Design a protein with these regions (language model features):
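N-terminal secretory targeting modules
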Residues: 1-146
């Protein structure tokens, strides 16, 4: 991807306490409606209010179908500096590498993050009062076992 792209935010929200309590080795899927469209996307993941490092074991973005379901063929794996996994220090933010994905204005998107290890009760997710992230009981994006 070209380094001279001009990025514009299309969706944001405030951190809010997770209502699911502690969990481990789960995929967290967040859905959102993009206000603007485009043909290239990247994702900003914040650990700005975190008290410990946040490990990302895998991530993807896709066009959302209905509920937590995604539109087949639209899923794009995300990388961070060319790597499939990343650790975000407490108080830091991380941007994914850009990926090609055609997003129409007002399109619904789904971002999935595989969070390996133990996630404590004080974990905060982004969301609005009635916009709840889905926590999968399966490791949808977990690394393959060799």
């Amino acid at each position: 991807m070209a380094d001279n792209l001009h990025w514009v935010g299309t969706w944001t929200t405030s951190p809010a306490p997770a209502e699911s309590g502690a969990f481990s080795n789960q995929t967290l899927r967040m859905t959102m409606r993009a206000s603007l469209g485009g043909d290239t996307v990247r994702v900003r993941i914040s650990n700005a209010y975190g008290h410990r490092p946040l490990d990302i074991g895998g991530a993807c973005i896709a066009l959302r179908d209905a509920g937590p379901a995604i539109i087949g063929g639209s899923e794009r794996k995300l990388s961070f500096g060319g790597e499939k996994t990343a650790t975000i220090a407490a108080g830091a933010v991380l941007f994914s590498d850009p990926v090609a994905l055609g997003v129409a204005p007002l399109a619904d998107l789904a971002v999935s993050l595989y969070l390996p290890g133990e996630i404590p009760n004080d974990f905060q997710v982004t969301g609005v009062t009635h916009g709840r992230p889905t926590i999968s009981r399966r490791r949808v994006i977990s690394p393959r076992q060799r």
